[in-house]
């Protein structure tokens, strides 16, 4: 029995959920998201709640049950509140700037690195060493944040690089003479 899957997904006021076969569409004040649920999982709407249940009793169906419930809950949260990820640039001369809707990063390379914002994701640069990524799709926000971090991940000796806000970088001791 999935402890996550058996919880109902609450639908707040102002959010409209449409079920068309296995496709769930969620409309809210921030936008619209759509996702096709695996065939092993059944979706029912009862009042202001969405209930999910496995159609068959297999290991895959149970796994997809919890996953589907979490993804639908993330869709509802995304269209009401949205998701945000913060990145910090640590290092001498490391800075970020907006270039239209794209992000221009100076990360110690001989050239600037430009990152285009995918659909539904926006960048903000409150300080030169801070990047805020916002959007309604949790996967898209997390994926672009990971992509930016991968350009120059924090190194263990000095801690320089792009890191998530609040991330603790495990430091190593340098070689001894």
UniProtKB/Swiss-Prot annotation:
Keywords attached to this entry: Ribonucleoprotein, Ribosomal protein, RNA-binding, rRNA-binding
Ligase is among the record's keywords: no
One annotated Gene Ontology cellular component of this protein: cytosolic large ribosomal subunit
Signal sequence interval, chain numbering: none
Matching Gene3D superfamilies: Ribosomal protein L6, alpha-beta domain (3.90.930.12)
Pfam families named in the record: Ribosomal_L6
UniProt-listed InterPro entries: Ribosomal_uL6-like (IPR000702), Ribosomal_uL6-like_a/b-dom_sf (IPR036789), Ribosomal_uL6_a/b-dom (IPR020040), Ribosomal_uL6_bac-type (IPR019906), Ribosomal_uL6_CS (IPR002358)
PROSITE patterns with a match to the protein in the record: RIBOSOMAL_L6_1 (PS00525)
Gene Ontology biological process terms from the UniProt entry: cytoplasmic translation
Any one GO molecular-function label of the UniProt entry: rRNA binding
Region feature Disordered, mapped onto this chain: 157-177
Role noted for this protein: This protein binds to the 23S rRNA, and is important in its secondary structure. It is located near the subunit interface in the base of the L7/L12 stalk, and near the tRNA binding site of the peptidyltransferase center.
Stored PANTHER family: 60S/50S RIBOSOMAL PROTEIN L6/L9, LARGE RIBOSOMAL SUBUNIT PROTEIN UL6M
Family: Belongs to the universal ribosomal protein uL6 family.
Subunit structure: Part of the 50S ribosomal subunit.
Protein name, UniProt field: Large ribosomal subunit protein uL6
């Amino acid at each position: 029995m999935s402890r996550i899957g058996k919880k109902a997904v609450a639908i707040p006021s102002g959010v409209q959920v449409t079920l068309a076969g296995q496709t769930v569409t969620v409309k809210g004040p921030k936008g619209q998201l759509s996702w096709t649920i695996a065939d092993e999982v059944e979706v029912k709407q009862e009042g202001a709640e969405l209930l999910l249940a496995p159609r068959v009793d297999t290991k895959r169906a149970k796994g997809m049950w919890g996953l589907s419930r979490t993804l639908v809950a993330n869709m509802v949260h995304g269209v009401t509140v949205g998701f945000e990820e913060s990145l910090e640039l640590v290092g001498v001369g490391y800075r970020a700037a907006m270039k239209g809707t794209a992000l221009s990063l100076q990360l110690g390379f001989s050239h600037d690195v430009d990152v285009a914002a995918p659909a539904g994701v926006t960048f903000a640069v409150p300080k030169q060493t801070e990047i805020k990524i916002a959007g309604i799709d949790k996967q898209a926000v997390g994926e672009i944040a990971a992509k930016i971090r991968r350009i120059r991940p924090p190194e263990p000796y000095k801690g320089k690089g792009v890191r998530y806000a609040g991330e603790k970088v495990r430091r190593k001791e340098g070689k001894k003479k």
